[in-house]
Amino acid sequence: LDPANAALVPRAELLLYAAARDQHADEIIQPALSQGTWVLCDRFTDATVAYQGGGRQLPSATIETLNRIATDGLQPDLTLLLDLPVEEGLRRAIGRNDQDGTAHEGRFEAETLAFHQRVRDSYWQLAEIHGRFRVVDASGTVAVVAGRIDRVLDEFLAERGIQL
């Protein structure tokens, strides 16, 4: 993610993410699911569709094939899309990177607003296609957004008859 890797071509970026996702699925996700453990994942195959497909404009068929190979077809039961206008999301990401010392991971943050709008549009297209998506308004304080997420999770669990 280091901006120093600016010469990394989009297809190589896609392959690196697919390889990382494959390793993550094999080492972490599948063993946990096999033990009946719930898995929460910050970004998964939808991020590849949005960033490398929408943002980088790589062919969706290629991305779908790589995602399927990397995860053995694993799909989440629920996907939370924390949505913000592009400018606000980018401002927050840059601020977070500066605050936690990961400003060197700013490759995506250095992209154009048009890139980020394509990413957001791609996420919205996924949300319209897949019923597992719940869109959460991410504007407001951390506490406000957390409350919105809590309500979505409560509804999701109630729909499945799960009580915690």
Question: What residues fall within each predicted segment?
Answer:
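ATP-dependent small-molecule kinase phosphotransfer cores
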Residues: 1-71
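Short beta->alpha linker loops
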Residues: 20, 44, 84-85, 140-141
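Alpha-helix boundary/capping detector
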Residues: 22, 26, 43, 77, ...
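Short, polar/charged, Gly/Pro-enriched helix-capping and turn/loop motifs at alpha-helix termini
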Residues: 31, 39, 77, 159-164
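Short loop/turn elements that form and flank the Walker-type P-loop nucleotide-binding site
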Residues: 34-35, 74-76, 129
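Hydrophobic/aromatic beta-strand patches that form the interior of the parallel beta-sheet core
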Residues: 40, 78-80, 134-136
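A glycine- and Lys/Arg-enriched "phosphate-lid" helix/loop adjacent to the NTP-binding pocket
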Residues: 48-120
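NTP-dependent small-molecule kinase module
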Residues: 87-164
